[in-house]
A protein has these predicted regions:
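A residue-level marker of the well-folded mature domains of exported/periplasmic proteins
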Residues: 2-360
């Protein structure tokens, strides 16, 4: 549980999903938004982390029974308990992230157009892939994650069509239960299989499982020409002038290309820094930003200011609810002319000139 602040402060309960608040991704982003609200708005933050899937939702009821001012459910798996509890506790305000509750009077449903942000990171991957093969690593095989896959695939294909090349997207999922969000070992196995098929950039939308991909990429570092499967070859070398970490040459040799991951939800670029030197090649290509931190913070702020409203709230490219990460860690991987191109694509999506699919 969080620390207790001033007696008059509003009490906010954060019920996390599978993976917990230190997953460096989805849940952690919500935790960071809550921490900022505690600092800026002088609210008390309490949290509940399930130790197994059967405990998901327990925190929601506990916070409601204690009369909290706002209860936030982090993840679609919390929707059922949020909806049931909200009907019973009409004086308590609720917010659910990544799902839509039919209980609109006192529940804010915070949803994201993940496909739009995924299109942009897919576009970047399509422009910079060195093999024409990229991977997608989903967590739980559900429609929510299919949106990430659909947008990513469409972005890759859009970029490759512009460049007159044929690209392949390899999709795999960790599993079909909530445990799929927290199984980095399985994600590592999938990453290895995608590498053997020639994937040089892999995008994970898998919560804590995505850390398995990140570990794998930093461990492997590259694809070697001798290991490429039949029909796959190096088609370009966009990173040849980027200084490599000291151990790259000995591990990879000359006839190789670096391998990259694309992070998700939070900015995970920094996790690709293998030698604590942002000036050398970073294995984090970019991250699809899903501003769960902003959604969490804004919900708390609305309660503090008395402007809270139930119902659907949509976060998209148009309101910076999703996007892509560019920072000191990956600036050498995405040149200025490509930034201009992806920004133009972003505007085309916002203006409806490009329609991004939601389904695979």
């Amino acid at each position: 549980m969080g620390e207790v602040g001033q007696a008059q402060a509003l009490r906010i309960g954060i019920a996390f999903g599978e993976g917990g608040k230190n997953d460096r991704s989805f849940n952690q982003s919500a935790a960071e938004g809550a921490a900022k609200a505690k600092e800026d708005l002088q609210v008390e933050i309490f949290d509940f982390e399930p130790t197994d899937p059967s405990q998901i939702g327990q925190g929601v009821r506990k916070f409601a029974e204690e009369g909290f001012d706002l209860v936030v459910g982090v993840g679609f798996a919390l929707e059922a308990s949020i909806t049931t509890t909200a009907k019973e506790f009409q004086d308590v305000k609720f917010a659910v992230i990544d799902s839509v509750s039919p209980e609109e009077s006192n529940v804010a449903s915070l949803v994201f157009r993940e496909q739009e942000g995924s299109f942009l990171v897919g576009y970047l991957a399509g422009k910079q892939t060195q093999t024409g093969v990229v991977g997608f690593l989903g967590g739980m095989d559900i429609p929510l994650i299919h949106r990430f896959e659909a947008g990513y695939r469409a972005g890759v294909e859009y970029a490759c069509k512009e460049d007159g090349i044929t690209c392949k997207v390899i999709p795999n999922y960790v599993g079909t239960t909530p445990a799929a969000w927290n199984d980095p070992a399985k994600a590592k196995e999938i990453s290895a299989a995608q590498q053997t098929q020639g994937a040089d950039i892999i995008y994970a939308a898998a919560g804590g499982s995505g850390l398995g991909l990140i570990d794998f990429v930093k461990q492997e570092k590259c694809l070697k020409a001798a290991d490429l499967p039949s029909g796959v070859s190096f088609i370009r070398d966009p990173f040849k002038d980027v200084p490599k970490p000291a151990d790259y040459a000995s591990a990879c040799g000359e006839d190789s290309r670096p391998m990259f991951f694309i992070g998700v939800d939070a900015n995970q670029n920094y996790l690709g820094d293998a030698d604590n030197n942002p000036e050398t090649l970073n294995y984090g290509f970019t991250s699809m930003l899903k501003r769960v931190d902003v959604a969490t913070y804004d919900s708390i702020k609305a309660v503090v200011e008395g402007t809270f409203k139930g119902g659907l709230q949509d976060f998209s490219l148009a309101n910076d609810g999703v996007g892509y990460a560019l920072d000191d860690f990956n600036k050498a991987l995405i040149p200025a002319d490509l930034i201009s191109k992806v920004e133009a694509v972003k505007q085309d999506i916002i203006q409806g000139k490009i329609t991004v699919p939601e389904n695979r």
